[in-house]
């Protein structure tokens, strides 16, 4: 009888692939040495499907059935020597992470001032930033510096180009606030702002916007206006690049076609915004004239009557802040940095962004009124002076934060060098404290500062001819208050 043949069980994988017998030499077999091949070692797993002929047809499950999957691959691999040493069991959590569907939120403060929100990054967009004792609904705000810059670029550079043929300017007045509730539209706006800054770079926001638009079109109750706005912005993003990418353009058109959208649906973007409260009450809420008279010491009533009037004026201001429409509330709010910030370009003021000059002017008038009332209460009521002092600081910081964001803030100034330096936030006592309290030591100084600020506000109003009637009330009040001290012409508004 011949010699019994045996099959190698620990041979190399290279000889097995070549279908030749391996001598099982270590660390390299002779066959691999002769042919100058790599001698591969290890265990190869072959999964063989069994009982394929007797497989039963898949049962149809009713909609909504919960399925649970068991991963048995690690249990199989653990039966081998190598698998038992290398494979580690991983516990998989059954809880799914919540998607990022909302932007940072901040609540309005009790006195209506802009909340001191915390700065969050784009990866922390679900963080809720609420002010204490807030009786008002939470507001969605952009609190990330980079995203605030992209939004500012979109409003200043991209949106005017897209609204050049539409009188109501939907991409300037409507889209930014809708984007705070819809991540797809928000990412599309961020992508356009980033493309304007870096035309040759691909934006991560573009991919997120396309993905969000695809999910939106798959919903049974698709918001056609949202899809049209997002698709239009994505097309604008593609147009701003070096060359129009046909593949991406086809994908955008396919998404629009899937949602049964056409050009006529864009009418849903044009809406006439209406104020959500009585216009006369909103105007009366910021009665700057009486506040200025009291601050200058020309109020002749008794201290008790003065206190009652201050409470009434403060109630008007709070009511205005509570009922003002969302379009007149801040779109972005970035708190000031820490006092020990080492950056040379660090500012002591918050960065506040509004959409439209009317919102900016209205909020500035509101903060000036609250600042005057807080100063009066601090002087009349010693027991509440600390709380009033805190309100003065908060409103003063917001005034400087809003005024420092305007592009045309210096075009209408015709002031002496000292007042101009004051408005540039560069006076020496102001740098040391970061507040406006130290520059108001006397009533005369306060009146001088107001005389410098109000012409600045009227300069912003020069572009609001279509909304002249909304500010006629303020023009008359400020004209009476300022008299001949300020160089402005209300008829030019």
Curated annotation (Swiss-Prot):
Major place of residence: membrane
Biased composition annotated in UniProt, kind: Polar residues: 116-129
Localisation per UniProt entry: Membrane; Nucleus
GO process annotations (BP): positive regulation of transcription by RNA polymerase II
Coiled-coil boundaries: none
PROSITE patterns in UniProt: ZN2_CY6_FUNGAL_1 (PS00463), ZN2_CY6_FUNGAL_2 (PS50048)
Record-annotated membrane-spanning stretches: 445-464
Bilayer topology annotation: Single-pass membrane protein
Residue ranges flagged as DNA-binding region: 12-39
Gene3D superfamilies xref list: Zn(2)-C6 fungal-type DNA-binding domain
Record's GO cellular component terms: membrane; nucleus
Superkingdom assignment: Eukaryota
Keywords associated with the record: DNA-binding, Membrane, Metal-binding, Nucleus, Transcription, Transcription regulation, Transmembrane, Transmembrane helix, Zinc
Region (Disordered): 94-129
One GO MF term: DNA-binding transcription factor activity, RNA polymerase II-specific
Xref: SUPFAM superfamilies: Zn2/Cys6 DNA-binding domain (SSF57701)
UniProt entry tagged with the keyword Metal-binding: yes
Function: Transcription factor; part of the gene cluster that mediates the biosynthesis of the meroterpenoids arthripenoids.
PANTHER family listed in its UniProt record: TRANSCRIPTIONAL ACTIVATOR PROTEIN UGA3, ZN(2)-C6 FUNGAL-TYPE DOMAIN-CONTAINING PROTEIN
Stated name of the protein: Transcription factor atnE
Gene responsible for this protein: atnE
């Amino acid at each position: 009888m011949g010699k019994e043949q045996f099959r190698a069980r620990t041979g190399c994988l290279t000889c097995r692939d070549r279908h030749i017998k391996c001598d099982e030499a270590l660390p390299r077999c002779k066959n691999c040495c002769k042919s100058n091949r790599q001698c591969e070692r290890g265990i190869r797993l072959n999964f063989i499907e069994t009982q394929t002929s007797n497989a039963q047809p898949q049962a149809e499950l009713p909609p909504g059935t919960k399925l649970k999957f068991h991963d048995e691959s690690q249990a199989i691999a653990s039966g081998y020597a190598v698998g038992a040493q290398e494979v580690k069991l991983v516990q998989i959590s059954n809880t799914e992470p919540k998607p990022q569907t909302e932007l940072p939120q901040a609540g309005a403060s009790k006195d209506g001032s802009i909340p001191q929100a915390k700065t969050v990054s784009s990866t922390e967009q679900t963080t809720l930033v609420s002010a204490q004792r807030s009786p008002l609904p939470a507001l969605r705000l952009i609190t990330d510096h980079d995203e605030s810059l992209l939004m500012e670029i979109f409003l200043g550079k991209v949106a005017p180009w897209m609204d050049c043929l539409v009188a109501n300017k939907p991409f300037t007045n409507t889209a930014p606030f809708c984007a705070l509730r819809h991540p797809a539209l928000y990412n599309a706006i961020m992508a356009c702002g980033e493309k304007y800054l870096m035309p040759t770079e691909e934006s991560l926001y573009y991919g997120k916007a396309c993905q969000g638009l695809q999910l939106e079109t798959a919903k049974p109750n698709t918001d056609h206006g949202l899809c049209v706005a997002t698709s239009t912005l994505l097309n604008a993003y593609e147009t701003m690049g070096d060359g129009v990418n046909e593949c991406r353009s086809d994908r955008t058109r396919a998404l629009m076609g899937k949602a049964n959208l056409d050009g006529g649906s864009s009418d849903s973007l044009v809406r006439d915004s209406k104020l959500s409260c009585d216009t006369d009450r909103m105007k009366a809420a910021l009665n700057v004239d009486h506040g200025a008279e009291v601050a200058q010491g020309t109020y002749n009533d008794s201290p008790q009557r003065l206190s009652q009037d201050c409470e009434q004026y403060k109630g008007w201001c709070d009511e205005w802040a509570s009922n003002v429409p969302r379009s007149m509330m801040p779109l972005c709010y970035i708190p000031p940095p820490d006092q020990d910030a080492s950056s040379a370009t660090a500012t002591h003021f918050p960065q506040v962004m509004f959409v439209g000059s009317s919102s900016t002017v209205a909020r500035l008038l509101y903060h000036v009124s609250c600042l005057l009332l807080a100063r009066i209460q601090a002087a009349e009521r010693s027991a509440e002076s600390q709380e009033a002092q805190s309100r003065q600081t908060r409103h003063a910081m917001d005034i400087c934060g809003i005024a420092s964001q305007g592009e045309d803030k210096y075009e209408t100034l015709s002031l002496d060098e000292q007042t101009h330096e004051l408005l540039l936030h560069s006076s020496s006592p102001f740098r040391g404290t970061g507040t406006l309290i130290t520059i108001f030591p006397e009533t005369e100084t306060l009146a001088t500062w107001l005389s410098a600020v109000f012409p600045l506000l009227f300069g912003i109003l020069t572009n609001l001819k279509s909304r002249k009637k909304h500010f006629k009330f303020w023009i008359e009040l400020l004209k009476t208050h300022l008299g001949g001290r300020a160089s402005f012409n209300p008829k030019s508004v």
